[in-house]
Amino acid sequence: IRRDNACIGIIMLSAKSLESDKIKGLAIGADDYMTKPFSISELLARIDALMRRVQRLAPEKQTDGRLVSGQFVLDQKSRMLYKNGEEIELTQVEFQIMELFFVNSGVAMVREQILQGVWGEGYFGDVKIVDVNIRRLRMKIEEEASAPKHILTVWGYGYRWNG
């Protein structure tokens, strides 16, 4: 589901109530986890809260092929990135990583997800190529690459875009 639409909220409903089951459900991609029995009013409240969060995190998509995230504009037609109106030149791979980040804004992604999203499922190289490209992107878009504010490291996990 996440591969088809990264800006969709997922609530897992389960009869399994052990803490380890809840942790596993959240780790595999659920945004929320509810155990049976539950009330319909609680489910509806959680759906409303999740929808607010997803709408806030989703990039502002415009009909002209541009994605907007904070001070950044990713123009999919010209394959250009702009920060505060200034053009930032990107390689093809860097552009694809940024596109993946914009579509998954606020979502922590493991290196393997980034590899699959950019290089495809058939790539069998080292996942460290993601780190190399992230380092290059940070040098291009961050005020201070050593203290990033946009491409954040999620320690022990991967990266998250904060537009």
Task: Name these PLM-found stretches.
Residues 49-108, 112:
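Short, Lys/Arg-enriched segments at the junction into DNA-binding effector domains
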Residues 41, 107-118:
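Short coil-to-helix segment of the ABC ATPase nucleotide-binding domain corresponding to the Q-loop/switch region
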Residues 46, 93, 126, 133, ...:
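Residues within the DNA-recognition helix of helix-turn-helix
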Residues 3-67:
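Basic, amphipathic DNA-recognition helix from helix-turn-helix-like DNA-binding domains
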Residues 11-13, 98, 152:
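Conserved hydrophobic packing residues within short motifs/helices of P-loop NTPase cores
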Residues 97-98, 114, 137, 141:
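DNA major-groove recognition helices of helix-turn-helix
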Residues 37, 44, 91, 124, ...:
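Conserved catalytic core of two-component sensor histidine kinases
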Residues 57, 64, 89, 134, ...:
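DNA-binding patch around the recognition helix
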